[in-house]
């Protein structure tokens, strides 16, 4: 019984030692004061990728036109790329039609991204025309920067090749490269 009492007393002393810090008193023995409270962990706010530029080139050996969307600090993870009919060239938020030159169109959507700064100023071109150094891309035009969704439309000289051939998107750290087949 004495052994159990001694162990439980040691356990209490150990627990109290972890919870309190002994501070010498001015007049006499030590006094016990509570340890400083630990502040709650502040959650880390994710940084929104911001579109900072757009460039285009032709890769003859791969038979594709490349449209590169440059972001800071990193490219967004969620990107969709697909051919769409002219009837789907609509402005995000308002639903108004967006005029884009071309015979067929690619819609590029970046989720959890922005194309503006804190004051609402555009951080990337909203319209690239004419697009030089490509064989198929005619125009790259903004379709919206609304509630964390950035949309661009790419107008093409050639008709869409059919459902078996689709444009692709590749992440390269700070960029998303959209590859559009040419003939």
Q: Which residues make up each language-model segment?
A:
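Secretory targeting and sorting signals
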Residues: 1-27
């Amino acid at each position: 019984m004495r052994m159990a009492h001694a162990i439980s007393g040691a356990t209490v002393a150990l627990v109290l030692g972890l919870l309190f810090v002994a501070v010498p008193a001015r007049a006499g023995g030590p006094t016990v004061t509570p340890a400083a409270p630990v502040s709650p962990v502040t959650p880390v706010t994710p940084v929104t990728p911001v579109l900072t530029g757009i460039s285009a080139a032709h890769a003859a050996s791969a038979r594709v036109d490349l449209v590169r969307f440059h972001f800071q600090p990193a490219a967004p993870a969620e990107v969709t790329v697909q051919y769409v009919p002219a009837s789907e060239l609509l402005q995000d938020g308002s639903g108004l039609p967006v005029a884009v030159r071309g015979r067929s169109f690619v819609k590029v959507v970046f989720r959890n991204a922005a194309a503006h700064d804190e004051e609402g100023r555009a951080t990337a071109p909203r319209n690239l025309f004419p697009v030089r150094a490509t064989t198929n891309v005619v125009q790259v035009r903004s379709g919206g920067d609304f509630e964390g969704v950035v949309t661009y439309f790419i107008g093409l000289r050639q008709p869409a090749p059919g459902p078996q051939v689709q444009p692709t998107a590749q992440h390269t750290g700070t960029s998303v490269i959209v590859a559009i087949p040419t003939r």
